[in-house]
Amino acid sequence: MSEKLQKVLARAGHGSRREIESLIKSGRVSVNGVVAKLGERLEDESSVVRIDGHIVSAKVQEEVICRVLAYYKPEGELCTRHDPEGRRTVFDRLPKIRGSRWISVGRLDANTSGLLLFTTDGELANRLMHPSRQVEREYLVRVFGEVTEQKVRNLVKGVELEDGLARFEDVVYAGGEGMNHTFYVVINEGRNREVRRLWESQECTVSRLKRVRYGDIFLDKKLPRGGWMELDLKEVNYLRELVELRPEKETMLDLSKDNTSRKRERARSQKIRRAVKRHEERVSTSKGRSNNPARRKPKKNAGEQGARNKHR
């Protein structure tokens, strides 16, 4: 099987297909030492592909299994592969894989926690992030300020931000007292700090923000902060169908619904928790307490699921 070079590189996470096409047109991509041409096809993984002289991963479709992780990002972690100041990044705790790499589906601010998806398929990541797909993202947000019915109507109708009109698809009150209020809000694009800026437009300050859903993938209440779990084939194909990609036939998971599998999954969850704890202890030892963000025990979020179900 052969595939177009730009498609292979986009799936490997080196940019969107249009960005890769631009790189090829600029002569910045080579295959086996020869400058690549737009539309060139790769036959197998034996070809050596370089971008700006650096060897990059490039596998044709038959050699790639699309994998997706759901990660519970804690506050304080950065959505970058490498930080020059040595701060924690969301990639630090992810499992190592050979012949591929994890690609984040969008980003979350350092001060935002919650669900962050990772995949080995760059094309899937790019499509899920693209505004034209209008994939819903749901957040649990705590705001400080006076929240009136008119302000909520403004947020649903749409307000003009510096980068254009923005709005919430849904706003549901989830409790609060005094000037502190908690809401579930839904957006269908991923502009920078969009949730925070929308509330700021109504003279309200976001004091806590947590993503709880991406499409129909929810943050699992059993997942600890800093923990991850791999999605099964059904969930992976739900995401692929959502953005019009052909379904996968294989998965790296082999979990049925029997009791043995459930026990195995519980043991896996406990293993993740222990790994997270060991990681935090290593970071604390190497950097000292002064460089560590404050840590809190994860709260049980069964109530969040119930509150969401009420307005879906």
From Swiss-Prot:
UniProt EC number: 5.4.99.22
Active-site feature positions: D109
Biased composition (Basic residues): 263-277
Disordered: annotated span: 254-312
Keywords tagged on the record: Isomerase, RNA-binding, rRNA processing
Matches recorded under InterPro entries: PsdUridine_synth_cat_dom_sf (IPR020103), PsdUridine_synth_RsuA/RluA (IPR006145), PsdUridine_synth_RsuA/RluB/E/F (IPR000748), PsdUridine_synth_RsuA/RluB_CS (IPR018496), RsuA_PseudoU_synthase (IPR050343), S4_RNA-bd (IPR002942), S4_RNA-bd_sf (IPR036986)
S4 RNA-binding domain ranges (all copies): 3-74
Origin superkingdom: Bacteria
Listed GO biological process terms: enzyme-directed rRNA pseudouridine synthesis
Stored CDD domains: PseudoU_synth_RluB, S4
Catalytic reactions of this protein: uridine(2605) in 23S rRNA = pseudouridine(2605) in 23S rRNA
An MF annotation (GO) of this entry: RNA binding
Family: Belongs to the pseudouridine synthase RsuA family.
PANTHER family given in the database record: PSEUDOURIDINE SYNTHASE FAMILY PROTEIN-RELATED, RIBOSOMAL LARGE SUBUNIT PSEUDOURIDINE SYNTHASE B
Stated role: Responsible for synthesis of pseudouridine from uracil-2605 in 23S ribosomal RNA.
Protein name: Ribosomal large subunit pseudouridine synthase B
